Amino acid sequence: MTIWFDMDGTISDLYAVENWLPMLRAENPKPYAQARPLGNMQMLARKLNKLHRAGYTIGVISWGSKESSKAYLEAVREAKEKWLDKHLHSVKWDAIHVVEYGTPKENFKLGAEDILFDDEERNRESWGEYSFDPSQIMEILSALG
C-alpha cells in the first residue's frame, strides 16, 4: 500500500506566501521554496518513517503551476524536492511525482487501497475510497500503525 501526499495546501502552505500567485504567473519558483510547513513536520516524519519500516510505500503527487512551460515545471519540481528535503529530510520517499497541473492523481495509484491526502476536493473525489483531507493526516497515519 502506498501513502500519497499532495504538497500545496496539504503539507506546504504555498497559499500563505505573500504574492504567491503573481510570482507563479511570472514563472518564479520561489513561493514553493518559501512556503512554511503545515503541521508538525517532525511528528509527521516520525510517523512516516515508522510506517515505511513496517512496509508501507510513501510518495508525493503534486501539481506544477497552472500555466507553466516545461522549464518552469522542472524548476518547480526542483523547488518542491528541496522543500521536502529541508522539512522532511529523514523521510525516504519511494516516489516523488511533480506533474503538470490538472493531471489526474488517480493515474498514479498502485493499488486499490492506496491512500491520498489532498486539500483539493475534486482530487479526493476522483481518487475514490481512501482519500482524505489534510486535517486527517495524523489520525489516519496513527490508525495505520
Stretch-by-stretch model annotation:
Residues A75-E78, V91-V98, D133:
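Lumenal/extracellular "mature" regions of secretory-pathway glycan-modifying transferases
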Residues T2-H87:
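Alpha-helical substrate-recognition element adjacent to the catalytic core
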Residues G111-G145:
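Acidic, Mg2+-coordinating phosphoryl-transfer loop and its flanking beta/alpha structural elements
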Residues T57-G59, H97, I115:
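A structural signal for isolated positions on well-ordered beta-strands in alpha/beta enzyme cores
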Residues M1-I3, E113-D114:
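The start of beta-strands in P-loop NTPase/AAA+ ATPase cores
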Residues W93-E113:
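Donor nucleotide-activated moiety binding/catalytic core segment of transferases
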Residues D85-V91, P104-N107, E120:
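Metal-dependent phosphoesterase core characteristic of DEDDh/y 3'-5' exonuclease domains
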Residues I61, V98-Y101, P134-S135:
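Conserved beta-strand termini and adjacent loop/short-helix elements that scaffold enzyme active sites
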